[in-house]
Amino acid sequence: MANADTIAAIATPSGAGGIGIVRVSGPRTRAIAQALTGKIARTRKVYFCPFRDGDEAILDRGLALFFPAPASFTGEDVLELHAHGSPVVLNWLLRRVCELGARRARPGEFSERAFLNGKLDLAQAEAVADLIAAGSEAAARAALRSLEGDFSESVRALFEALTHLRAWLEAALDFPEEDFAHEEQDFLSAPQLADGLARLNAQLAELLAATRRGVRLRDGLHVVIVGRPNVGKSSLLNALAHSERAIVTEIAGTTRDVLRETVNLDGIVLTLADTAGLRESRDVVEAEGMRRAHAELGRADVAILVTDSAHEQTDSILLGSAPPGAARILVHNKIDRSGESAHRILNKSGEIHIWLSARTGAGLDLLREELKRLAGHGEATQGAFSARARHVQALQDVAAHLRAAQEHLQQRTGELAAEELRQAQQVLGEITGRFSSDDLLGRIFSTFCIGK
């Protein structure tokens, strides 16, 4: 896909540094390179040269690298200017490049052009942003695997399997007199369809599980700590974060707002949220804090309900705002006062109970191990790839279409089954961008940084 305009942006983070990069891509790149450097852009050449303004005054000296189309990141002619990392110098260069016919790039526009020109599929393009934003080594390795195409290859394999199944079903519908639909056999009950659907569902289940692990690696877990006032919620946050992040006092109601802290737990990123104590209150500020606590709980992946083990109360009702799919851990704190030992139990209703002391640290390892387990730590993360919530939703939609197709086959409505398979394939193609709306592309690439 040829773009009529040339784009440019500063590709390195804002602020001063040893080196800064201005990136240019598009049809005017060669002309811009020659006007700015006085050099004719050649392949496999790195030039150390002055960068000049319109009056031939030197803006800086640095390296100019030219990547001709299609052998570049975007698939277009690309120029990189490596200059001193002063924001002033880099803005001089960017302004000069725009004077020569480029325009400032939108966020993610370089990656968008790489996608549109077939250099990356959509999942790989998203992996570029995920690698830049990776908050742990495990997340970075997973993003690299997605960038190398591991996730896309799994999606393509499923897409091809769907293609074969659709081809068989639609051919049988269009040409019922052929060999694959014997007169004595209802082709909708043929083993090819049943076996094909079974294999598809197995592939899909495996990919969906791996994708959920990928989302956890990318996003981490949102862990919300709730409970009545003065049960040790802030102490628990501080203990998990290994810092005095929250104010701890004997005065109930100290925490009025949601306090968040990011923790790296053996490669799993946890966003911990300490919330206001939940109780009846006429204090307007405290009541607002409790409203925010319930709102935060409504977005939780894991809800931790903290109680005082020395004065146990039935507080499970406080978890009422947690989403249905959120994991729930009941922490019985202050065992240093109640005299109980640190331990963990899983009761008959499936609730996880952990007895610990946030003050002394006794039992904290039990909670950390439980959080790691919930995050999928050790679940084949060695070969995990990065993924996003939209990928999980797409695969869930594919599963729904496959279930509907199976029901239509059982009801002998082959045309409707074929339509469900077509829709499943359409949704699957949206993951890699084989089928994508302009709105979807706009939403994805607008979240990228400028210059990428």
Regions found by a protein language model. Name each.
Residues 1-141, 145, 149, 329-330:
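A glycine-rich (often HGG/GG-containing) alpha/beta subdomain
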Residues 23, 237, 274:
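Short, acidic/hydrophobic/Gly-rich beta-strand patch recurrent on exposed beta strands
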Residues 48-68, 253-281, 299-302:
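Switch I (G2) and immediately adjacent beta-strands of P-loop GTPase domains
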Residues 286-310:
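Inter-motif core of Ras-like GTPase G domains
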Residues 118, 230, 274:
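Conserved G/P- and acidic residue-centered "switch" motifs that form tight phosphate/ATP-binding loops
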Residues 272, 306, 331:
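Generic enzyme active-site microenvironment
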Residues 103, 269-271, 352:
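Conserved beta-strand segments of alpha/beta enzyme cores
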